[in-house]
Amino acid sequence: MSEKNGARVTAILLAAGKGTRMQSSRRKQFMELGGKTVLQWSFDTLKDSAIVTDLVLVAPPEETEEVWNRYLTENGAAEEAYTAFKGLSEDESSAKDREGKPLAEKGGCDGAASGSFDHACVVAGGAERYNSVFNGIEAIRWPCDYVFIHDGARPLLTEEMLEKLLAAVEQYGAAVAACPSKDTVKIADDRGFVASTPDRARVWNIQTPQCFEYSLVKQAYETVIGEQTHGTAPQQNEKPKITDDAMVVEYATGHPIRLVDTGYRNIKITTPEDLLTAELFLRG
């Protein structure tokens, strides 16, 4: 794949979320959609992409081996593979697989098929989304120019989106999938009353992938995680809760973020109604 595209692009595919708003005991990324799991749709797009060269798949800590077997071993997706475990207890990190091999050293998956990844691994997710992304960035042990961070709960990713994002991140260093807001948005005060109304023409709904130069996003996450670790981060009421990667880069580096219009079909599966909408899009 690296011969098709001069840039080395690592995709971090996030699949560790709990999905409490789905009102189901099953994680939304593993629910069925059109004959596949929700996660499988975006995994397949990344695997078959002429742009993405490498993959880090971030899974629930208790399901890393299952995800490894289902999405990597079964797809023959890695020539050189590692399983890294971040943020686990000592007992968990010393766990063994069925053959008695330490999971923290598990590797293999020789002989990648054409159209798969040059390098791939599974890592355990963290307490919050940004912790999971940081674990994913820390797992990159190969040459990397750009990082594409994508929610596994967004199944309708396309190669065209990836192409537009690559062009933008190569030019600007930071680019995120987005679409212009269709709705008028209100800013609320603490009591639930309207405080202000931003100009709708300037309001965008943010999606994923969110794409950055590797060195930029690595520096940004190391800064934010370092502040939390050493207790130097601003108090909770002084900064908003981090909900996406662009916020991390904005806060830590001030680097401008380019918005890339990827349309309205790139929805996130959050509620049962979203599954129905995605089914309709897949039917065409």
Task: Please place each PLM-identified region on the residue numbering.
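Short beta-strand-to-turn element immediately C-terminal to the catalytic PLP-Schiff-base lysine
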Residues: 33, 186-189, 269-270
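Residues at the starts of beta-strands that form the adenosine-phosphate
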Residues: 53-55, 173-174, 256
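Conserved alpha/beta core of the MobA/IspD/sugar-nucleotide pyrophosphorylase nucleotidyltransferase superfamily
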Residues: 3, 204-284
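Short, flexible, basic/aromatic active-site loop/helix in glycosyltransferases
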Residues: 187-212
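Residue-level signal for inorganic ion chemistry
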Residues: 13, 39, 136, 151, ...
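Conserved beta-loop-beta/alpha segment of the NTase-like Rossmann-fold superfamily
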Residues: 117-188, 207
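N-terminal glycine-rich phosphate-binding loop and ensuing alpha1 helix
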Residues: 3-67
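Intrinsically disordered, low-complexity terminal tails and inter-domain linkers enriched
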Residues: 73-118, 226-240
